Amino acid sequence: MDSLPDEFFVRHPAVEDQRKEETENKLEKSSGQLNKQENDIPTDLVPVNLLLEVKKLLNAINTLPKGVVPHIKKFLQEDFSFQTMQREVAANSQNGEEIVPALTLRFLITQLEAALRNIQAGNYTAHQINIGYYLTLLFLYGVALTERGKKEDYTEAENKFLVMKMMIQENEICENFMSLVYFGRGLLRCAQKRYNGGLLEFHKSLQEIGDKNDHWFDIDPTEDEDLPTTFKDLLNNFIKTTESNIMKQTICSYLDCERSCEADILKNTSYKGFFQLMCSKSCCVYFHKICWKKFKNLKYPGENDQSFSGKKCLKEGCTGDMVRMLQCDVPGIVKILFEVVRKDEYITIENLGASYRKLISLKITDTDIRPKISLKFNTKDEMPIFKLDYNYFYHLLHIIIISGTDIVRQIFDEAMPPPLLKKELLIHKNVLESYYNHLWTNHPLGGSWHLLYPPNKELPQSKQFDLCLLLALIKHLNVFPAPKKGWNMEPPSSDISKSADILRLCKYRDILLSEILMNGLTESQFNSIWKKVSDILLRLGMMQEDIDKVKENPIENISLDYHQLSVYLGIPVPEIIQRMLSCYQQGIALQSITGSQRIEIEELQNEEEELSPPLMEYNINVKSHPEIQFAEINKDGTSIPSESSTESLKDLQEVKSKQRKKKKTKNKKNKDSKEDQVPYVVEKEEQLRKEQANPHSVSRLIKDDASDVQEDSAMEDKFYSLDELHILDMIEQGSAGKVTTDYGETEKERLARQRQLYKLHYQCEDFKRQLRTVTFRWQENQMQIKKKDKIIASLNQQVAFGINKVSKLQRQIHAKDNEIKNLKEQLSMKRSQWEMEKHNLESTMKTYVSKLNAETSRALTAEVYFLQCRRDFGLLHLEQTEKECLNQLARVTHMAASNLESLQLKAAVDSWNAIVADVRNKIAFLRTQYNEQINKVKQGFALSTLPPVQLPPPPPSPEILMQQFLGRPLVKESFFRPILTVPQMPAVCPGVVSATGQPRAPLMTGIAWALPAPVGDAVPPSAGLRSDPSIMNWERITDRLKTAFPQQTRKELTDFLRKLKDAYGKSLSELTFDEIVCKISQFIDPKKSQSQGKSVSNVNCVSPSHSPSQPDAAQPPKPAWRPLTSQGPATWEGASNPDEEEEEEEPCVICHENLSPENLSVLPCAHKFHAQCIRPWLMQQGTCPTCRLHVLLPEEFPGHPSRQLPKI
């Protein structure tokens, strides 16, 4: 397991004896000497000794992996308070109490709790503590709580293992400890008798061992080749043991049952209630009710419970047939589902009938010959139905014979392991041979001698020892100190030592197999004996819940333990019943047939005057009457107690051999021997007189010895009814009344003297044997002392070497720790720098991303605004054209109404209707195209990738339409041909097709008709310029003036309009909007009225109702429709006007100064400004000051072709 020598872990007999002698010497030392010894103890030896003590307390520590051992040593060297334990030992020795062992489980748990509290109180982080050390402490604490075995300990241990699992999941470097977590939980489940859960945990632990070459899971080799060498081998051993426990020690036989403990089978849970199936071989299989349903549906679907009658036993390896099935829902109430019964073979008086009379009339025969009546059951017989008193009897039989033997054997095995027992038996062979070296032909194992000294030099197995043999070995081998009053006297109530309790248990065993077996017992007697036996078993180490379980178990389950009872009693239970029946029908004492040699009647008649046996004597007078009368039964009070019937048998044989060699002995006494033995003899004589005065007690002692002999007899696998015991009660009562006394005073005195003589002789022989034994043991102890001295010297050398090596390793560890600490500090500094740089980069990236998102959103909004402005700009001109066409249609309609006979006017009306409809269709088409592109831009499409919007073609000429309506061929020159001028659409992006190289054409404000003189009077040109009075309202004119003159306030413009209205007779209905703008400009700046009129005509082009600019207020507007001779063919893209080209340059509407080519800036909407004027405006507003079109500066989106202005 660790690097220490193997001698530290192998239990050497010499070392064990030395430890016992040192403990005995410590008891004799005073408190001062003890304190001095504590001070003299070298501190270097403390860790080694403590490690050995911890290994003894926790069995799992002996085979832990190498990776855990250094942490255990660290705990024992650094955190274990050895001085506290020494102070407790010193205090106990000063108070006169018995010194406790060097280390107890309670003290180890206390030290582990203190170490864990120190770690938790320090509030360390995962980087500051040793995770492996902390996990090792948790594991040791959980295993120690599991070893202690209290209910609250199981809960706390489960919590500690859960904490281990969570810590390991957080720290992957400690993943090897996960195997220990599942291993500890498996030990916990097995301690709770939840073997299925424990098996699952062991398999999980085995799976956690991944790499077979990982030396972390290795185990240090030992001298014992049977021990595992790796942790994996250890887990495989635990798995095999757990699988065996599932088949043997559990109650529920369903493999998937998680509550298979015996204590759960009758609790008020979902597992309450059980089914019991019994086969012809007396095998009993149990299932929880819920588990039985699952098992039956899985293995035998569709079958009911009664169909299992006669099927093969469910127990593996059993060849019997199921003969009985019980169901238990409430403790004590059993429902029989099916059974196979043959009632004519019950052992009862009613069923025996004539066979019973024949049994009573049989003559005296050899006791080894059984009567001809057959008492054997068929393989499918029903179990017996017991009376109330035998219900109590069998409960006591189970708790004393089975439970008592198990607990005493457990104590005996701890104190005397098989190797040491074999050695002690060889040493004391001469002492034991006189008691046990004789043949017991009816014992299945060959008798006690074959048990103590098996053939082929095998180790003796204590599992085959009965209670009395264990007591005899404890007595002769001095395993425990003798009781206060010795082995031959009943211990007082104040003596609660182990030896006294074992002696009391054997006493109750004798009473049970004698008086209680014959007479039964009442409920009060049962409760009294049960209380005393329970107290004895509790002091010996049995759990209270196990005792209560035996008491609450139904009689049907208790009686099924007769297999084990046959082994512990030494003779099969059916044979005991048969021999008792055979004995009582012949009138022979029960003691003479239960394992002892029968005393021949004739031999006793011929040797009436000879010496009687020192232990017990039967004087039987045979008369003419066929029945046998008992004369008197006397038993020597100085005989060996009834803990072993084998001793009594051997003494009886020795005395009988002496009787055949001698006839009489002289009535002499040795004075020296008498003086030495006077107190002992007087005590025994008083006891003898009491027993002679009470014949009932003599009969009781005989029955005790008879019951002791039954322990080592043969064993069979059948069980018989106890009803025949009532027959024995009847026979015993009939025979007891016929006993008479036949001796006189002279015979009694002679027997008393002879008894004393043999008593003294036996004591002398006993003293000689004791002297030889003590001499031999003293010599052997001297040899062992020399061997121990050599071992101690070698161990001291190894300890010194180990201490030097440990100190060297500690220095190396300290240097490595410092190096690791420096590396951790450097790593921490670099990590902090990396984190700061990462934080700065993340913040920078976040800022740029937010800016990018904002600019992207702004660009998207700008593109949408751009398309909306282009759409509104294009629709503005088309709507204006539609209005002009409507006006022309209205005029032509009015003229046609006044001249109904003119076909030319009717054709003109039809042509203008067609033009209006065509313009309206083009308006709808253009609006649809722009809206589709706006939606695509909103969906994420780039404006540069969209196809350009195609402008609709110009409407047909009215003259062509008129010719079509009149049905005439086209005329080259026509009087009615109008000229339609369409404003230019400036191109600002690839999505709009426009002639960018041509100058901007003025908006068409109206269409004038030039009619010939014969048709009618000419219409004044000014009439075509007047707008409809209904649409000219005050607010609309004010808004348009505000757009044309942004530097003026609304109040100032309103005042100018009022002045103009007063000048024209309180009405502006006769003035057009261009005339109003011209008049207002004169009011604002008379000096610049002419230039302002030009700029107003330029500004008003964005409004649907604006009129074209006029060079002079008095000059009439130019008509849109001209004769063919005066104007060339009109195109939709517009044509340049030579007159307009000759006009002066328009002023800047911001500063009202004239524009020059040097500092001219033209916006996408074709408005012109000074560069120094428009740039600050665009940086603040982002729109054209005239038409409010959204405009972007080049530096906002550098490199984007659609954002480049002609000149800024």
From Swiss-Prot:
CDD domains: RING-H2_DZIP3. Pathway: Protein modification; protein ubiquitination. Transmembrane segments: none annotated. E3 Ubiquitin ligase proteins mediate ubiquitination and subsequent proteasomal degradation of target proteins. E3 ubiquitin ligases accept ubiquitin from an E2 ubiquitin-conjugating enzyme in the form of a thioester and then directly transfers the ubiquitin to targeted substrates. Able to specifically bind RNA. Its EC number is 2.3.2.27. InterPro entries: DZIP3_RING-H2_finger (IPR033103), HEPN_DZIP3 (IPR041249), TTC3/DZIP3-like_helical (IPR056872), TTC3/DZIP3/RBM44-like_helical (IPR056870), TTC3/DZIP3_dom (IPR043866), Znf_RING (IPR001841), Znf_RING/FYVE/PHD (IPR013083). Residues 14-43, 647-676, 792-853, 904-939 form a coiled coil. Residues 637-647, 1089-1112 have a biased composition (Polar residues). Its main location: cytoplasm. Gene3D superfamilies: Zinc/RING finger domain, C3HC4 (zinc finger). The gene is DZIP3. It is found in: Cytoplasm. It comes from Homo sapiens (Human). Residues 10-38, 637-698, 1088-1145 are annotated as: Disordered. Residues 10-29, 648-657, 670-693 have a biased composition (Basic and acidic residues). Keywords: Coiled coil, Cytoplasm, Metal-binding, RNA-binding, Transferase, Ubl conjugation pathway, Zinc, Zinc-finger. This is E3 ubiquitin-protein ligase DZIP3. Pfam families: HEPN_DZIP3, TTC3, TTC3_9th, TTC3_DZIP3_dom, zf-RING_2. It catalyses: S-ubiquitinyl-[E2 ubiquitin-conjugating enzyme]-L-cysteine + [acceptor protein]-L-lysine = [E2 ubiquitin-conjugating enzyme]-L-cysteine + N(6)-ubiquitinyl-[acceptor protein]-L-lysine. GO terms for cellular component: cytoplasm. Interacts with DAZ proteins. A zinc finger (RING-type) spans 1148-1188. Widely expressed at low level. Highly expressed in skeletal muscle, kidney and heart. Expressed at low level in placenta, lung, brain, liver and pancreas. GO terms for molecular function: phosphatase binding; polyubiquitin modification-dependent protein binding; RNA binding; ubiquitin protein ligase activity; ubiquitin-protein transferase activity; zinc ion binding. Residues 658-669 have a biased composition (Basic residues).
